[in-house]
Amino acid sequence: MRNCLVAQSGGPTVAINSSLAGVIQGAIDSKKFDKVYGSLNGVQGLLNGCLMDLTEKVEQVPMFIELLKKSPSMYLGSCRYQLPDYTEDDAPYAYIFNKFETYEIDAFFYIGGNDSMDTVDKLNTYAKAVGKDVKIVGIPKTIDNDLCITDHTPGYGSAAKYVASTLLEIGHDTSIYPINSVTIVEIMGRDAGWLTGASVLARNKYNHAPHLIYLPEVAFDEAQFIEDVREAIKKYNNVVIAVSEGIKNAEGKYISATSAVEDTFGHSQLSGTGTVSYTHLRAHE
């Protein structure tokens, strides 16, 4: 028999260790693998030779898998490493697949979001190109629910609950004042408004917040935004606005991207959408 390898990457969620537990338990139950190895800090663990025997861990700690399901953060750690195009630099790929042979790995499971799935795709493409029979499997995890062809991913539900709970508390806190107020809450979501949209769950018969919601899927119109706020203030006095970090104007340009920096995968690290929205409001007082 052969072995399998699993790694985690991206940001932590309340569910990502449950996915890891599922891989370990599933591999053991299948009886197709002698050992389940874990790569520490994502694909970088492979490049640095940092692997651990998870099968041994299960044998040493009988409750390990059950404890893992309830553990926060990421048991195997994470990374922000981007593999190069193998046609330009195949050295990391050759090293990784050499490790697969050394540890007799038949299947590699990578738990993560879009960037992790990019790594999965690159490794799978390389494997086919050089005739390596290693199964490369991506396991979805992302709190902003933006993985293609995926209805909802592990991690989104808990993040959506957090957003809704936070907006509910903000709504109650701001409603106590007799003066007009506008509170803008900027929520994660570069190109997908699922998390910001989840803020609507805060509404109930005692709380109308968030009164206004702006998503990246709909072009942001400054004039309409100002008018929306004016009408909301007339009706509610204290207005709470949920706005996605990735809202764009009619030209498709990010509202907050003027001073954005890029991460290791070339994504704009957006911030300041709330500040820009606030500036628009102050300019039309």
Region roles according to the model:
Residues L51-I105, L168:
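Glycine-rich oxoanion-binding loops at beta->alpha junctions
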Residues N3-T13, M74-C79, D106-G112, G138, ...:
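Short glycine-rich or small-residue beta-strand-to-loop segments that form or flank ligand, phosphate
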Residues N124-T153, G157-A164, P210-E217:
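Short, acidic/small-residue loops that bind anionic groups at enzyme active sites
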Residues T279-E285:
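Conserved small/polar residues in nucleotide/adenosyl-binding loops
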Residues I179-Y214:
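Conserved anion/nucleotide-ligand pocket segment
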Residues S19, V23, D115-V130:
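Short Gly/Thr/Asp-enriched flexible loops that form oxyanion-binding sites at enzyme active sites
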Residues I233-Y254:
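Oxyanion-binding "anion nests"
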Residues M1-L51:
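N-terminal phosphate-binding or glycine-rich loops at protein starts, especially the Walker A/P-loop
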